[in-house]
Amino acid sequence: MLVVIMFFIAFVFCSWLSYSYLCPYISTKELNKSR
C-alpha cells in the first residue's frame, strides 16, 4: 500500500512539475500568436 501512495505522489509531482514548466511556454506562445 505504501508503494502505491509513493507512486501516486511521484506521479502527481511529475505532472505538476511538467504543467508548471509548460504553462508559461504555452501562454507566451499564445501571446506571440495573437500579437
From Swiss-Prot:
Protein's organism: Monkeypox virus
Virion surface compartment spans: 23-35
Transmembrane feature ranges: 2-22
Record's protein name: Entry-fusion complex protein OPG076
GO biological process: symbiont entry into host cell
Subcellular location: Virion membrane
Keyword 4Fe-4S: no
Regulation: induction: Expressed in the intermediate phase of the viral replicative cycle.
Membrane topology of this protein: Single-pass membrane protein
Chief localization: virion
PTM annotation: Unglycosylated because produced in viral factories instead of the classic ER -Golgi route.
Quaternary state and interactors: Component of the entry fusion complex (EFC) composed of OPG053, OPG076, OPG086, OPG094, OPG095, OPG099, OPG107, OPG143, OPG104, OPG147 and OPG155. Except for OPG095 and OPG053, each of the EFC proteins is required for assembly or stability of the complex.
Superkingdom assignment: Viruses
Family as reported in the entry's similarity comment: Belongs to the orthopoxvirus OPG076 family.
Keyword annotations of the record: Membrane, Transmembrane, Transmembrane helix, Viral envelope protein, Viral penetration into host cytoplasm, Virion, Virus entry into host cell
Function noted in UniProt: Component of the entry fusion complex (EFC), which consists of 11 proteins. During cell infection, this complex mediates entry of the virion core into the host cytoplasm by a two-step mechanism consisting of lipid mixing of the viral and cellular membranes and subsequent pore formation.
Entry's Gene Ontology cellular component terms: membrane; viral envelope; virion membrane
Lineage, uppermost ranks: Viruses, Varidnaviria, Bamfordvirae, Nucleocytoviricota, Pokkesviricetes
Keyword Membrane attached: yes
